[in-house]
Each structure stands twice: as C-alpha cells, then as structure tokens.
C-alpha cells in the first residue's frame, strides 16, 4: 500500500520502520517543524531515501503525493486537514493512546494517570475534522496501576502496542475487512494539553470559540531517559 506518514520522535520512527519493512511504499512523511536536533523519524526516512514532503505545521493537500492511498498519523499532534484525507483512497487513520472516546486530546496518557484510571489502552480510529472523534477500527485494553505508575511507564507499555496496532490496521484496510464503529458520545471526554499549543487546522475555516482551557503544568520529568512525548529536552 502507498502510505504517507505524519508523525515524530521514537513512535513515528517505529511506525515508519515497521511499515517500510513490511513492504509498503512510503510516499512521504511530515514531521513537526525541525529545530537544532533532527527528529528520529526524519533520520530514518533520510537513511531509506524517503522524502520529507513538508512539516506537519504547513501540511496541505497539495503536498500529499499523487497516488497515496492512506495517511497514517503516528504521534503527530497536528490536525490533518480533510482535504489531505480526501485525497487518499482509504482516507487516514491514527493511533490514540487511550480507549476512545475517553481522553480525547493531546495528553491522553497524562490524563489517564491524573484521573486514576485503572484501565487504559490504544485505539486506531479514522481521521476527520473532529479531534480524535472518528470511527473506531481497532482497540486494545490494558490494566494499569494509576497509583504506582507515572505517565512514562504507561507510555512504555502502550508504545509497542501502538506500533503493532498500526501494522494490523493497515493489513485490515488493505484486505477490505474493515468494520468501523462509531464512538459513543455519551462517554466522551476531552482534556486540554498540559504543555502543548492548541491544535492548528490547515485548510479549514474555524468558526466558534476555543475548545481548550488552561491547565496547570506538570513538572518536567528529570529522570526519564526515553525519547517520549513528555520531556521538553527530547523535543
């Protein structure tokens, strides 16, 4: 399958590597805007001769290569426009580190721990105009210790699960065996990010007010050696 990946860091790299090694044609990638330190996903793409088409912040449908069949969002933290999604035969999918519709938003792992959930997991869902609100293709559940774990420990558990789920989802889509399930809005929650800016929507006229409120910031982790989604020094 011809796949375009929007992602970043270790998770984006792991998803890119898995799909590339499974024989899929990667038509391009879109990482976040690059700073002094090169993103790990970008480094792997350059090693394999995969084109960095645009950064996520400026991605529009014109930048999606012709013939792309599927967009995969792998820890991108950017809204992908509906025009980009519509350009692809199978649209787009994303991995979210919670059991949607619970904990929509950019900091699902942190909020899972903060709210003392005993159950978490991962979701593969259809990308669309609603943040983390698309139909569900796959879900995996895990039990957690909300009083003994921190967000890093939960993410370390969900990381490999997420990579496996993306791989499985692509195979399901390729085989035409998709069964999509709508999210039950009765149980939906949306929490704001602790540290990240509000989502930017390219190619979309935004009407109405903001959906995010201010939240107090967690202290930066000083012990974590993992290239995770929480440590500013690894961004």
Write out the residue ranges for each language-model feature.
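One-carbon transfer enzymes
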Residues: 1-235
């Amino acid at each position: 399958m011809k796949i375009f990946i929007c992602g970043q860091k270790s998770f984006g790299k792991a998803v890119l590597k898995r799909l590339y090694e499974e024989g899929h044609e990667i038509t391009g990638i879109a990482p976040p805007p690059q700073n002094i330190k090169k993103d790990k996903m970008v480094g792997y793409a350059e090693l394999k001769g995969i084109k960095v088409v645009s950064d996520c912040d400026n991605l529009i449908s014109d930048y999606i290569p012709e013939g792309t069949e599927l967009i995969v969002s792998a820890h991108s933290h950017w809204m992908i426009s509906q025009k980009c999604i519509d350009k692809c035969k199978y649209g787009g999918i994303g991995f979210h580190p919670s059991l949607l519709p619970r904990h929509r938003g950019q900091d699902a792992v942190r909020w899972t721990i903060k709210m003392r959930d005993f159950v978490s997991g991962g979701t593969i869902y259809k990308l669309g105009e609603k943040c983390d609100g698309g139909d569900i293709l796959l879900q995996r559940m895990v039990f957690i210790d909300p009083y003994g774990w921190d967000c890093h420990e939960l993410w370390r558990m969900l990381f490999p699960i997420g990579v496996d789920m993306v791989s499985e989802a692509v195979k399901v889509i390729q085989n035409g065996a998709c069964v999509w399930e709508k999210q039950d809005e009765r149980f939906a929650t949306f929490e704001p990010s602790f540290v990240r800016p509000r989502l930017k929507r390219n190619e979309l006229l935004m009407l109405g007010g903001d959906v995010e409120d201010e939240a107090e910031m967690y202290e930066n982790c000083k012990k974590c050696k993992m290239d995770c989604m929480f440590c500013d020094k690894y961004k």
